[in-house]
């Protein structure tokens, strides 16, 4: 069993924010793969289904970003899951727009949602880092992630959310490199990421 957590802030005010791309991904996973309707659970909204014949629970914490760990801990305890069973989808300013990287453990790069989760369940969970780009200077980061994606960005955002959801089953069995490669090649084919130098196919 796996717990897939999408990070974001609840409410229509934040719906289109860069910070909410994690919510967008788990919403699309639920839609694409026929998960059960969302219902209020674990200080958030949860939906159950299966990917690659493995039971998966999707979770959108309603605690606001900085307290995401409370909801994740509640769900993990209920299902008796370890941090290794948890996959977190989140915005990543240190990656260019439309890029995706997967890693287990490591630093939190100033992300308050990850900080909260690590404080509650430990650090060795899988993170799917969804690139939203950096505004250029540290002082603009807060406004950058709490603003909506620009109209010009929406095509790649919709494509990325779709491709990540399509290939989400690979994350259930920790086929992280295969997941990264499939997402990278699909986004490249759609013209949203440039062709890499020889030998770089979207790996870590």
Swiss-Prot record:
> EC number(s) for this protein?
3.1.1.29
Task: Give any Pfam family that matches.
Answer: Pept_tRNA_hydro
Name of the top EC class for this enzyme: hydrolase
PROSITE patterns (UniProt xref): PEPT_TRNA_HYDROL_1 (PS01195), PEPT_TRNA_HYDROL_2 (PS01196)
- Gene3D superfamilies noted in UniProt: Peptidyl-tRNA hydrolase
* Family, similarity comment: Belongs to the PTH family.
| Name the record gives this protein | Peptidyl-tRNA hydrolase
Native organism is Nitrobacter hamburgensis (strain DSM 10229 / NCIMB 13809 / X14)
Q: Which gene encodes it?
A: pth
């Amino acid at each position: 069993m796996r717990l897939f957590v999408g990070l974001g802030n609840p409410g229509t005010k934040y719906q289109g924010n860069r910070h909410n791309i994690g919510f967008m991904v788990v919403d699309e996973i639920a839609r694409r793969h026929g998960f059960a309707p969302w219902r209020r659970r674990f200080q958030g909204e949860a939906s159950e289904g299966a990917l690659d014949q493995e039971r998966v629970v999707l979770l959108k914490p309603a605690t606001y970003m900085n307290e995401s760990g409370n909801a994740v801990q509640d769900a993990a305890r209920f299902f008796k899951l370890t941090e290794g069973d948890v996959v977190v989808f989140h915005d990543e300013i240190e990656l260019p727009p439309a890029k995706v990287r997967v890693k287990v453990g490591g630093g939190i790069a100033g992300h308050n949602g990850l900080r909260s989760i690590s404080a509650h369940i430990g650090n060795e969970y899988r993170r799917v880092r969804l690139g939203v780009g950096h505004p250029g200077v540290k002082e603009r980061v807060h406004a950058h992630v709490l603003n909506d994606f620009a109209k010009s960005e929406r095509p790649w955002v919709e494509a990325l959310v779709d491709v990540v959801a399509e290939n989400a089953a690979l994350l259930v069995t920790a086929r992280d490199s295969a997941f990264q490669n499939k997402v990278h090649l699909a986004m490249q084919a759609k013209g949203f990421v440039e062709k890499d130098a020889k030998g770089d196919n979207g790996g870590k």
